[in-house]
UniProtKB/Swiss-Prot annotation:
Keywords: Cell membrane, Cytoplasmic vesicle, Membrane, Merozoite. Residues 1-12, 28-37 have a biased composition (Low complexity). It comes from the Eukaryota. GO terms for cellular component: cytoplasmic vesicle; plasma membrane; rhoptry. It is found in: Membrane; Cell membrane; Cytoplasmic vesicle, Secretory vesicle, Rhoptry. Residues 16-25 have a biased composition (Basic and acidic residues). Residues 1-47 are annotated as: Disordered. This is EAMZP30-47 protein. Transmembrane segments: none annotated.
Amino acid sequence: HAASPRGRPQQRSSRHGAEGPDTTRRGSCCSSSSSCCRPSTPRHPHNHECKRQLLLLGALLGLPSNTMKYVLVQKKKKK
């Protein structure tokens, strides 16, 4: 059941949630991967929310905050 039928909202893994609602894109994207934290435009509305969720995720995983900050800096340098 991993492969969803075409034309369904579950396609957000390939489209990075661009078609989905705001909360779905922000939640699923930020918690599962950092793709939404590398927006195409510098003034992405969810950028700070992504950073916050990444830090929360790091806290849940038991990672020190400075490690998460380092990861965020590395992701910021990549365009």
